[in-house]
């Protein structure tokens, strides 16, 4: 899959499926609305209209189903007819699975995605997850032939006209962002260390005409970034705080996306075991998603100030490693007693959000991280967990997740009950909870929030993506689509405007909004 290029076209054109294999994909009632005249040129002379209709009649999705149309060259596949209220109407997760299992092999292939216009964005991002970019398989390295998958959307429903050119460009940039994030997360730390991650940031900056701000190694210590420095100081490749900033004329508010970029997490001196350490190359998933989303957002036009803050470190073991009982002074000015070196993500993010607040003057701060294993217990493998000081933004995250396919579900926000878990006798707080049975994912997020203050008047959103950042052994690029959708109102792109949760449409009780002091407008 690493040598596969995705091409989004308004019309994929006609071709014999034996020369260009084909997958037709959609919900069954949508597939029945596709006229034979539209697919005939992609199936003939191998498939007749009678065979096409017969194939549709055999489909019985539970939750999915597929039927070969011609040998191994053409297949039609059906998505679930209905989804529950906490799932995406696009059935995005099933799209990825069906593409992986049903798309015929070949150098040049075609996917016809049949859906309604509001599901185009989520469907495209789901398709992209089926084509990871990273591989080191020796056979793959010998196959230098570039493969292409052409994607055509056939729209049904009210807005059933052809897909516009601007939409195709948005889909290309969004899916490039998803695949970029997944590639970074899939790459092992012997290649994707902090130096390499900075190269990725510089590459995106050069493409966008932005020079990144980079603070690293001893300068972090000198300037007071005790969280990032303390976590990464034992590693061969030094830690860093990097920032990409987009500041257009006419901006009315400032947004900061803060990503956790732990390129590898051994656990530090509180070391992980042999079964829990493998896979910790994925601990940079938050920073990877922020990079992919920032690239796509700026390419599509972003009307407000947007800063991408990357907190990069390798949590390693060595003579200079942070010890339990050490006390670090963080950028917020607060002291933290370390009682668990494996609770390192919150330390680097605490510095990141403090920087966003103090130096960038952000009105809205969103941090994204593979923060806690408990997230998968709290909200499962498919739904990220959201913790925020705003009822409005909590509802917006859930709605944006359903629109883009990166699903989200709320955690309990109650600092007056939970923050006492971090009580320290010798510092302002400890970095790990006293009671792991007391909503640990919520508590971990509250640790981050405490470094901008629970009384901070702006909007703070924390997204824990520990479980959905991967599916099996592969990264998903989770978070890119979510950020683009959640902040779609600030985009100049019509498709991102469409998938954004509009402020007036977010389902929050009127009483909640009346009491909510964090009423920054939904962008």
UniProtKB/Swiss-Prot annotation:
GO molecular function: manganese ion binding; metalloaminopeptidase activity; peptidase activity
Annotated signal peptide: none
E.C. numbers: 3.4.11.-
A biological process from GO: proteolysis
GO cellular component: cytoplasm; nucleus
Residues at the catalytic site: 272, 346
Metal-binding listed as a keyword: yes
Pfam families assigned to the protein according to its UniProt record, in alphabetical order: Pdase_M17_N2, Peptidase_M17
Positions with a binding annotation for Zn(2+) 2: 260, 265, 283, 344
Annotated positions binding Zn(2+) 1: 265, 342, 344
The UniProt record lists the keyword Zinc: yes
Domain of life: Eukaryota
Keywords on record: Aminopeptidase, Hydrolase, Manganese, Metal-binding, Protease, Zinc
Matching InterPro entries: Leucine_aapep/pepB, NPEPL1_N, Peptidase_M17_C
Cofactor(s) this protein cannot do without: Zn(2+); Mn(2+)
Distribution of this protein across tissues and organs: Ubiquitously expressed.
Function: Probably catalyzes the removal of unsubstituted N-terminal amino acids from various peptides.
Annotated family: Belongs to the peptidase M17 family.
Protein name listed in UniProt: Probable aminopeptidase NPEPL1
Biological classification of the source: Eukaryota, Metazoa, Chordata, Craniata, Vertebrata
